[in-house]
């Protein structure tokens, strides 16, 4: 399954690339679906890259659902990369094993960039039984991530969706709903 999302951002390609690629380990600062993220060394280092990979805790539990993300390709000059995302500790019903993300930024004018996210999902066999639902849900999810990156780059602060997710997680940690 493949999902392609494009979004225009009112910022230079250098600024967008800096947040996405150079600050790769800190995705939890702007992505609402990631309560915590941290760098993880892998065997692949690329010239110009400040991170080899990251771990994203997806439910706020260090022993819970995670995504490990490793660069497969990285081009500092052209501002493109490919990231292998593997999901860990997921319930059996989860239809996706992981994703391959191709990320690209193009300069489209003064202080404007266009970001293209191409997600190719690695599906479990039962996902094909509900393929339209999985594709629809993943499309919404990727759309939200692109919106959150745009907001963070342009506004210099997390998207309201991230703030709401963080507040909800804090309430849950304190035993409130």
Task: Give the residues covered by each predicted segment.
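Residues that form or flank phosphate/diphosphate-binding pockets in enzymes
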Residues: 11, 66, 125
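Juxtamembrane/interface motifs at transmembrane-helix termini
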Residues: 35-40, 48, 102-103, 134-137
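Hydrophobic ligand-binding cavity/cleft-lining segments
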Residues: 1-46, 176-177
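Glycine-rich portal/gate segments that line the openings of hydrophobic small-molecule binding cavities
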Residues: 28, 38-94, 151-155, 160, ...
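Hydrophobic/aromatic beta-strand elements that line small-molecule binding cavities or substrate pockets
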Residues: 5-7, 67-73, 98-107
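Short amphipathic alpha-helical segments
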Residues: 12-15, 19, 137, 141, ...
